[in-house]
Amino acid sequence: MPTADFHQGEYVGEHFKARKFITGFSGSYGTAVIAKDDAGLWTDGRYFTQALTEMEGSGVRLMKMFVDDTPSTTEWLAQKIPEGGKVAFDGRVLSMGEGQEYEEVLGAKNITIEYEVDLIDQIWEDRPSLSKKPCFFLEDKYTGENVASKLKRVREKMAEYGATVHLIASLDDNAWLLNFRGDDIDFFPLVLDYVIVRKDSVDLYIDDSKLNDRIREEMAKNNVNIHPYNDIYEDAKKIGADEVALIDPMKMNYALYKSLPCKVVEGANPTILMKAIKNAVEIENIKNAELKDSIALTKFIYWVKKNYDKMEITELSASDKLTALRAEQEGYIRDSFEPLQAFGEHAAMMHYAPSKETDVVLKEGGMLLSDTGGGYYEGSTDITRTTVPVSYTHLTLPTIA
């Protein structure tokens, strides 16, 4: 059970937090493996302390990645599972590359892999449903390039690979390609979907209740056919044997890869480099987003310094205040990630986010570490600053005559 959804995203919606459900660990990165007589949680140094605290008494052991001789999940399974045994996982939440590694390593011990089973779903009685939040279209004044132009460029790259179809499962690539955004994952303007680009058409797999008339209009104009979200797996099996599919092994889930009956060409999604090179409109928009965020943060620092000794300001209330100041800026959508407001000793903890249980009051003599960001129509920001609550307005320094 990795930290992933069907699209290999590290940050996922509530429906996909199976690892948290089974282990109690809520960090953004980690993989749980459950055996008959043992269980382990693999994560990196950012989360060792958090994992030990949250998993206390759970029976799940912390496996410290990149420390000493800690085995990888694959190595651990190969050691743990006897010859001729069986390993089961939901192939939709494992990457194609991970699945192939399991095939190679476990296959050497004649271990069977069952990748079309979601055991957590069978025991998670109140599992949250998939998000149904609406999408919105991002106009040319924000993107600087329309859908038709982007599809043309992708098809040119497909031709270089000799591909007749291109399957895209990564949400950021699909959002960039079709110029719409969603709200299926907290703090990220993404929507759960798959895309198949063909020579003359596009198939979009999505919950169409999320689409507004503007998006439907743009999709129709670009010959984008809309299908139910989960139909992708059966439709992938229907791709002709004479077709050539371009897929990105780092961005494609294992189950979808196994559904393909045609020849496969592996390569990075062309959209990755395309969206990395910003056009003039995007560059100007990024500057505007950063200016808006700077205004909000400057107001926040001033507010902390002026009010920490006049009212009770805590880590959580500081987070709320900064979010409110960002919301005053035109074009604000949401925070770009969970606000990390850490005061005093909390500032020494990597990726500390305050909660009702850990929240503390800001006092003179300590330091507030603010690691936050804002999401705007023009772009997203990520900024870290330290603020020291003090009651004086100037410093007197000793001088040497």
How would you describe each model-predicted region?
Residues M1-P82, K86, L94, E98-K237, ...:
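N-terminal accessory/capping or targeting/presequence segment of soluble
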Residues I123-A163, A169, I277, K287, ...:
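Flexible inter-domain linker/hinge segments
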Residues E10, Y376-I383:
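Short, Lys/Arg- and Gly-enriched loop/turn segments at beta-strand edges
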Residues K80, V105, K157, Y161, ...:
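Generic, well-ordered alpha-helical scaffold segments in large soluble proteins
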Residues T393-T399:
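Conserved small/polar residues in nucleotide/adenosyl-binding loops
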Residues H15, Y102-L106, S380-Y392:
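Short, compositionally biased
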Residues E114-Y115, D121-I123, V264-N285:
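Terminal amphipathic helices with adjacent charged low-complexity linkers/tails
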